UniProtKB/Swiss-Prot annotation:
This protein's name: D-ornithine 4,5-aminomutase subunit alpha
Superkingdom classification of source: Bacteria
Regulation: Increased activity in the presence of dithiothreitol (DTT) in vitro. Inhibited by 1 mM potassium phosphate and potassium chloride. Inhibited by L-alpha-ornithine, D,L-alpha-lysine, L-beta-lysine (50%-60%), L-alpha-lysine (26%) and by delta-amino-n-valeric acid to a lesser extent. Significant decrease in activity is observed in the presence of 0.2 mM p-chloromercuribenzoate, N-ethylmaleimide and also by 2 mM iodoacetate to a lesser extent but not inhibited by arsenite.
Keyword check for rRNA processing: no
Record InterPro entries: Cbl-dep_enz_cat, Lys-AminoMut_A
Source taxonomy: Bacteria, Bacillati, Bacillota, Clostridia, Peptostreptococcales
Gene3D superfamilies membership: 6.10.250.2220, Ornithine 4,5 aminomutase S component, alpha subunit-like
A Pfam short name: OAM_alpha
Length: 121
């Protein structure tokens, strides 16, 4: 079975557009596709994803687990464990590693809650 060539019909609505207009249309359509995915990524996370982020930041699996557990205990999971580590490092002017280790030991959580305006109660 051979498909009928209907290319000219399918492109009719694009035929009169300039290259610049086509490029603009392409990026608008790409944003429509990607925006919901980005939104899902921003709003939904899991302990596994957060541990994975921390592993890529250089923490061991045990350190990452401790940070994620404490993040969940304080209702800050939606902020992202890696984001919390990064913000504390910036706030305290210390390395990301030092911030993460301190958080895994229970330090700086009051600061994290303050920075992120509290967690989920």
């Amino acid at each position: 079975m051979k498909r009928a060539d209907d290319f000219q019909q399918r492109r009719a609505h694009l035929a009169n557009l300039s290259d610049e207009e086509l490029q603009t249309r392409f990026w608008e359509m790409a944003e429509k596709i990607v925006d919901p995915l980005l939104d899902l990524g921003k709003k939904n996370t899991t302990p596994s994803i957060e541990r994975s982020v921390l592993l890529r930041m250089g923490f061991s699996s045990l350190e990452a687990k401790a940070i994620v557990d404490k993040t969940m205990d304080r209702g800050l999971m939606g902020k992202g464990a890696g984001h919390i580590v990064y913000k504390i490092a910036k706030e305290k002017n210390i390395s990301v590693r030092e911030a993460g280790l301190a958080l895994s030991e229970g330090k700086y959580w009051d600061d994290a809650i303050q920075i992120f305006k509290g967690g989920v109660k």
